[in-house]
Curated annotation (Swiss-Prot):
One of its GO terms (cellular component) is plasma membrane. It comes from Clostridium botulinum (strain Loch Maree / Type A3). Gene3D superfamilies: 2.40.30.20, ATP synthase alpha/beta chain, C-terminal domain (1.20.150.20), P-loop containing nucleotide triphosphate hydrolases (3.40.50.300). This is ATP synthase subunit alpha. It is found in: Cell membrane.
Amino acid sequence: MNIKPEEITSIIRQQIENFNTNIETIDSGTIIQIGDGIARVYGLEDCMEGELIEFPNDVYGMALNLEQDNVGCVLLGSEEGIKEGNVVKRTKKVVEVPVGEALVGRVVNSLGMPIDGKGPVLTTETRDVEVPAPGVIDRQSVKEPLQTGIKAIDSMIPIGKGQRELIIGDRQTGKTAIAMDTILNQKGKDVICIYVAIGQKQSTVAHIVNDLTKMGAMDYTIVVSSTASDSAPLQYLAPYAGCSMGEYFMHKGKDVLIVYDDLSKHAVAYRTMSLLLRRPPGREAYPGDVFYLHSRLLERSARLSEKLGGGSLTALPIVETLAGDVTAYIPTNVISITDGQIFLESELFNAGQRPAVNAGISVSRVGGNAQIKAMKQVAGTLRLELAQYRELAAFSQFGSDLDKESVKRLEKGKRLVEILKQPQYGPMPVEKEIIILYAAVSNHLIDIPVNKIKEFEKELFNYIDTHYRDIGKDILEHKQLTDELKSKLDKAINDFKNVFLSEI
């Protein structure tokens, strides 16, 4: 057998030419401890804080503790089948969620995966979960109102687009109801709403989604749900994921409303993670950076400058108190971060005043600039008159004789309190709020019996819609009560009052 050296040479040359020199380097580590949804990994030398780590069984984790000899990761899925000695890999990416129009009308989890059984979310765009908040130059002041449709709030504690307004109160005082009514009131106003449920019962979230669907509000709403059965890391991520979804629309120049329900459970989830990661506990066993946990989330709400499109992200964080104690750690933290708070009281709620807003300690620090002039005109003295009424009501319980002026104030106060009551799922257009508040403040209701006020209000709107339809249009158009408009309103109210009183 003749072996020709030229043939061997050509074969070797061909092999060398076809040899692929692609070398793939994978930064990997080894699990040295796992349990309670926390994994400690040896290796991963150049790992970033918040980086996604790939575990076996298609489970991902997030690196949170970067220590000298190991990395502490929280698992974003089940730890079943993962054991010590398994190899994990770096992805060199941080946690991101899908964003875009395709999410509107859907119910998703903290990672943006659909959980409503309506198929995949058809979007290719993603956004990091943790994004720095816009700087001072990138913002403009809050000057446009975001109407909640709730008389007590729009008049005394107004909310502007780009504001952070805390809703705080004990359990079962109607906190979620206020947030829901605000979402319902955005119908037809080109506002995208995001409801983030953190640590809620699955049945509660299903009930909320059902109500939103029934009222036609899911057409402009995204629900991000991380229920009580989800792991602490998923509950921790939920508000940041919802915020990133909202920021996508904000940077497109749209107005967004986001509700975090609630941040007390969010802080508890973060405390759970921190204690399992062996971070030192502080006050109430929360870690030292629990203030930063919420401040970096809420600072992302803003009204962007015109140069950046003028979009806005308005936040309504909810915090639950225990026995009305607003001096606890999380409530004081969030009060100091937000631009005001709506305080709900169990006593008022149980006494039948719903929404149970305590106007005395509720405040909106920036919303006043956003209020339309007509509302300022009717609501200017409202808070003071209510405060005087409460003082007089407490004083009159001692049965002492009151002068005529005090009796008059008491009677007016009773009617104001009655006017501010409102049923759930009954948000009111701003022009109707102004009409009825004008009637109350201008002493038009003083001769209407208190138990007939609700009936009077309902029938007054029907009467105005039939006989004085242009009043509402004029209020929306001029955004202030001119002398001409006031006299027209006086005439309409008096005309109807005569009819109403004759029928009683």
